[in-house]
Amino acid sequence: MAQVFNFSSGPAMLPAEVLKLAQQELRDWHGLGTSVMEISHRGKEFIQVAEEAEQDFRDLLNIPSNYKVLFCHGGGRGQFAGVPLNLLGDKTTADYVDAGYWAASAIKEAKKYCAPQIIDAKITVDGKRAVKPMREWQLSDNAAYLHYCPNETIDGIAIDETPDFGPEVVVTADFSSTILSAPLDVSRYGVIYAGAQKNIGPAGLTLVIVREDLLGKAHESCPSILDYTVLNDNDSMFNTPPTFAWYLSGLVFKWLKAQGGVAAMHKINQQKAELLYGVIDNSDFYRNDVAQANRSRMNVPFQLADNALDKVFLEESFAAGLHALKGHRVVGGMRASIYNAMPIEGVKALTDFMIDFERRHG
C-alpha cells in the first residue's frame, strides 16, 4: 500500500510508531490476554497507565508542582463552559480576546454564564490578516480572568507571544491545536486546556492544566463532570474516563520524549512550516492571507489563483496520497494541518506535488 499523509485538522495523524505498537497490543495488552480497552479504569494496571501518562506529560511541558493535570471529557467546547463555571467566582465578567473562529466560539458559550468583555484583536497589516500584539490588549479591571486562543485552526492565525500581564491576571487559553508543538511557560497561565485530537492523541480526551489555587471556586450549578475540584479529587476518574484515548495519548507522550521532547519537536515544526510557506510565498499560483508574524505553524491555509481548480487539486492530491487538504467551509481553499505527527517527508511530498501541480495548471 502506498504511503498516505493525512493533513486533517483533527482528528489528526498519529505517529506511525504509536499506531504500530497499539496494533500489536490491541488484543493482548502486557500479557493479560485482554485489550487495554477492556480493563477496569480502577484496576492497578490502568492506574499505572494513567500515572505514567500524567508524569510524561508533566515532564514534556515542565509543569510546576502547584498545577494539577486533569484528563477530561467534553473537548474544547466543553471547556468553553468549564472555564467560566470554574473561575468566575462572585464576578460577573471576564476578558475574552477575539482573534478568530474558535475564540469567537468560546465567547458565544461564555455569554451563557457572564457578560464577557470582548477584546477585538483582529487587524490587517499590509492587506494580510493579523492580531494586535498583547501590549495593545485593553484588559478590564473587574474581569475574573482573561481568555484567548493561541492558534486558530480555521484561520491559520497564531499568537506566539507569552502573556505577561502580572500576577493578578488569571490567563486561560485554548491550546487544543498547538500544545506540545513548542516550549510553553505553564507558570504564566491559570488554566490551559486542549482537546486531544490534534497533537495529543485520538478524539474523546481533553487535558486541563489548572493552578491549584484556582480550585474550589466552581459555581454551585457547575456540572460535576466539569468541576475541576471534583475531577482533581477523583484523579480524573469521577466517572469512567476514555481509557483507550488516555492509553494512546500516553504512548504519544513516550514517542515525543523519544524524539527529543518539545524543544526538538519545535525545531522540526519550524522546518516543516518554513518549507510549506516557502513554496506558497515564492509562487503567484498559491497565496496565504495571514501576516508572517501571525502565521500558524500547525495549520496552513492557502488559496489557488483560480478556485475553479480546487476540485482538481483535491482529487489529484488525494490520488497522490495527500489526504484531507480541503479548507474549512468558512474560508474555503486548502488547508494543510502539519501537527507533531506529520513527518517532514509528508510536507516535502506536499510541496513537491504543489510545485508540479502549478507547472501543469498554472
Curated annotation (Swiss-Prot):
Note accompanying the cofactor annotation: Binds 1 pyridoxal phosphate per subunit.
Residues noted as binding pyridoxal 5'-phosphate in the record, renumbered to the chain: 76-77, 102, 153, 174, 197, 239-240
GO CC annotation: cytoplasm
Cell location: Cytoplasm
Cofactors named for this entry: pyridoxal 5'-phosphate
Coiled-coil stretches noted in the UniProt entry, renumbered to this chain: none
PROSITE patterns: AA_TRANSFER_CLASS_5
EC assignment: 2.6.1.52
Family annotation (Pfam families): Aminotran_5
Main location: cytoplasm
Single Gene Ontology BP annotation: pyridoxine biosynthetic process
The entry's keywords: Amino-acid biosynthesis, Aminotransferase, Cytoplasm, Pyridoxal phosphate, Pyridoxine biosynthesis, Serine biosynthesis, Transferase
Keyword Amino-acid biosynthesis set for record: yes
Catalytic activity: O-phospho-L-serine + 2-oxoglutarate = 3-phosphooxypyruvate + L-glutamate; 4-(phosphooxy)-L-threonine + 2-oxoglutarate = (R)-3-hydroxy-2-oxo-4-phosphooxybutanoate + L-glutamate
Domain of life of the source: Bacteria
Positions of post-translational N6-(pyridoxal phosphate)lysine modification: 198
Pathway entry: Amino-acid biosynthesis; L-serine biosynthesis; L-serine from 3-phospho-D-glycerate: step 2/3; Cofactor biosynthesis; pyridoxine 5'-phosphate biosynthesis; pyridoxine 5'-phosphate from D-erythrose 4-phosphate: step 3/5
GO molecular function, one term: pyridoxal phosphate binding
Binding site for L-glutamate: 9, 42
NCBIfam families listed in its UniProt record: PRK05355.1 (NF003764), serC_1 (TIGR01364)
Family of the protein in this entry: Belongs to the class-V pyridoxal-phosphate-dependent aminotransferase family. SerC subfamily.
UniProt function note: Catalyzes the reversible conversion of 3-phosphohydroxypyruvate to phosphoserine and of 3-hydroxy-2-oxo-4-phosphonooxybutanoate to phosphohydroxythreonine.
Subunit structure: Homodimer.
Protein name: Phosphoserine aminotransferase
Organism classification: Bacteria, Pseudomonadati, Pseudomonadota, Gammaproteobacteria, Enterobacterales
